[in-house]
Amino acid sequence: MTDKPQPGGLGSIGTAAVARVGYGAMQLFETSPDDAAAVLRRAVELGVNHIDTASFYGPGEVNRRIRAALAPYPDDLVIVSKVGARYTGEQPIPLAAAQRPAELRAAVEDDLSQLGLDCVPVVNLRRMDLGPAVGADGDQIVELDDQLAEMIALRDEGKIGAIGISSVPLDVLRRALPAGIVCVQNAYSLLDRSQEDMIDVCTAEGIAWVPYFPLGSAFPGFPKVSDNPVVLDIAGEIGATPSQVGLGWLLAHAPTTLLIPGTRSITHLEENIGAGDVALDAEAIAALDAITTPGTDPWAHGVEPFSEATQR
């Protein structure tokens, strides 16, 4: 037994037990190395043992900052990366597809080198079936089976511990299940519930459901959970912040949910981790469940919604 805090309670990703509130490191490229280290160390102090990253964050700089701040790593720390894109630095979208099997392998090798690991515990295959931000064309349109064969080979070689998948519709997840998928990362929040069937499958299969954009999109022109009047009312009633209500609803909504909210601020980090202590009663959950959502996936057409939003 341990008295170490477990924000949000205990969940799992593959065979690893993790706190249900983790940390998404993407924004650490946008701050100084010292500030990045402070955020990472504070996260671990508060019980975070699931950190999400990618070699295309930076490029590679976020991985290097994680290593500088936390290595030698705590025994219980699960670092999750993703492959399938590469950093370009171009605006408004600094990423391009890198979907070919050789590119997936190269990205894993980058993770190993940048993070100083012999094996990345979990690596997500970031497909281009759903958005946002990055699409695939030409030789970047790659068969799922070819990609999974490379991921399985990497797992068999001990370079990765387990395989996840990201930005995919339900039919692609079903096709991928025989590969031993341990987590799914798709866009999902209180205001975008187009993935309910996906959540049902994850729950039935014991797969970690790890939503990105858990508080609504950070892109211009898209709704944010913290602006919703129902969320604001409940936050005021229970003495929580709107963000904590939105994250707390996600934890209550599905038992295999793991959260990886990102921030470069220690204040916001502590707020996000505090969502694990938010208690929503049945009345509050019913009110949040009743919030009207579009009912369709806003990212179903890949890059277009992002491009339109950036022009508003």
Task: Indicate residue ranges for each PLM-predicted region.
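Feature marks short, surface-exposed loop/turn motifs that line or immediately flank catalytic pockets
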Residues: Q27-F29, Y57, A85-Y87, R126-P132, ...
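Active-site mouth loops of central-metabolism enzymes
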Residues: G24-D34, E90-A102, V134-Q140
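Active-site groove signature of glycoside hydrolases
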Residues: L112-A136
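Short, acidic/polar
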Residues: T31-A43, Q99-L115, P169-R174
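Beta/alpha (TIM)-barrel catalytic core signal, keyed to glycine-rich beta->alpha loops juxtaposed to Asp/Glu
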Residues: P5, M128-G295, A300-H301, P305-R312
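N-terminal binding-site loop/beta-alpha segment at the start of enzyme catalytic domains
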Residues: M1-K82, E150, G216, Q311-R312
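A structural motif
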Residues: V48, L117-V120, I160, I181
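Structural motif corresponding to the early beta-alpha repeats
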Residues: P72-Q99, R126
